[in-house]
């Protein structure tokens, strides 16, 4: 099955630039960041510790709802837009306006603007496919549209820097983040082999304020203006969870998102469960995973199987599986559909969910948006989904892996050379 995704276009353009010598580097020596931490004194202190080190605020009083697949996410998101009273903010990498589900979102945006709601939309200029008719319709209704990082002929290398975020914020009080794009491959009426297995979360409470702040940064980046009346305010507490909203940008200096992952892996004492379509680790993340195994932590990674939207990235990912399995890390390939969930569960208490894949592109190149959630109920729900997905997956065997045909190993090794741009 072929899933038409802009990631393949990005890969092709960037590789072409490398080939013609325009200064992009395939690989370079990087200092390995080795992170260790300790929860020996108090596990309760860890959220504040993580917030201080990443430079992002810790909120409390958040209520999370896990939304498994578009079946659950789309109705909840559309209902929130229909109920909006003051403002709607949306940032998306994938928005295919010709799809049935995107038409429903377009209708909802238009209807909200028509009743006086301030509707602001940020689309990635490469990933989103919005027809001129839909742009005109939304604009005439009063929607404000910004295009992230338009590709310019004099700065063609900027094609490599995208907003990969998937976020919806309503009235500064409720927000949705995760991996689900606005396209029919996430919709319920698609054939199961053409669908994406994915996860979103809905959060009501103070964390929604920080998600809106992340949106405002990119809204300004696209040329938009943030008026005083849309500056986020702290909504009332809604639930028992504490959380840290972490957003990243290639222009933002130290990558707080990557640091959050490394610190969370270092904090694990029992288990680490990772879901990500792509698995391209650098020296720092590989060290953190293997160090966890040395501490006796069980590490399971659930990745895409035969159904993929980017074969070169899949080949590059598979080149690393052997060395990870050799350290005792369990790797499973999801079989029924494309695995697109981006989630990490640590010790059944800490969860990370959002738009970031477990790869270099998400950690170093894309604008991403994730939430770190400290709530056992959320972690248990995500782990339940993880276990169900394992039942539809194939575990890779190290001995069989080492017996792969030479041409397959060579293909994977060649594509792994481009790992830092994937």
Please annotate each region the language model reported.
Residues 2-422:
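Charged, low-complexity intrinsically disordered terminal segments
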